[in-house]
């Protein structure tokens, strides 16, 4: 389930959607209930908050590219190179966000036992 949500989150352009953000908030609550060790629980919650932050970053990047493209297309003569540069910058940002998301997923996996993982995400 987490992998599917991360895929939607970071590849689907809806990183800041309320449903995805709610999922991360609910996951934080489940971690607090399931993980008895306070140190690991706190670390896992912090990682989930970071993932939630990445979703917000992705949403902001999408909003920015939309505004930039809107401005560029609003020009009488749109510059193809400028449009390509806007998309290139957006995809660069997405790659960075995606790379960080994968790293966070592995960090989260290290904090939870297999049983805890299943209880939190299944």
What are these regions (language model features)?
Residues 108-122:
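Long amphipathic alpha-helical coiled-coil segments
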Residues 26-27, 93, 120:
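Generic signature of intrinsically disordered, low-complexity segments enriched in small/polar residues
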Residues 1-3, 7-56:
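Immediate post-signal-peptide N-terminus of mature secreted/exported proteins
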Residues 10, 23-24, 66, 73, ...:
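Phenylalanine-focused residue identity feature
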Residues 37-108:
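Amphipathic alpha-helical segments
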């Amino acid at each position: 389930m987490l992998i599917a949500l991360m895929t939607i989150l970071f590849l689907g352009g809806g990183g800041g959607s309320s449903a995805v953000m709610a999922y991360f908030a609910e996951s934080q609550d489940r971690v607090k209930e399931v993980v008895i060790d306070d140190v690991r629980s706190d670390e896992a919650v912090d990682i989930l908050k970071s993932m939630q932050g990445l979703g917000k970053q992705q949403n902001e990047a999408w909003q920015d590219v939309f505004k930039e493209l809107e401005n560029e297309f609003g020009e009488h003569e749109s510059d193809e190179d400028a449009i390509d540069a806007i998309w290139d910058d957006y995809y660069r940002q997405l790659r960075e966000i995606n790379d960080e998301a994968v790293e966070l997923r592995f960090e989260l996996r290290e904090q939870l036992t297999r049983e805890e993982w299943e209880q939190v995400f299944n």
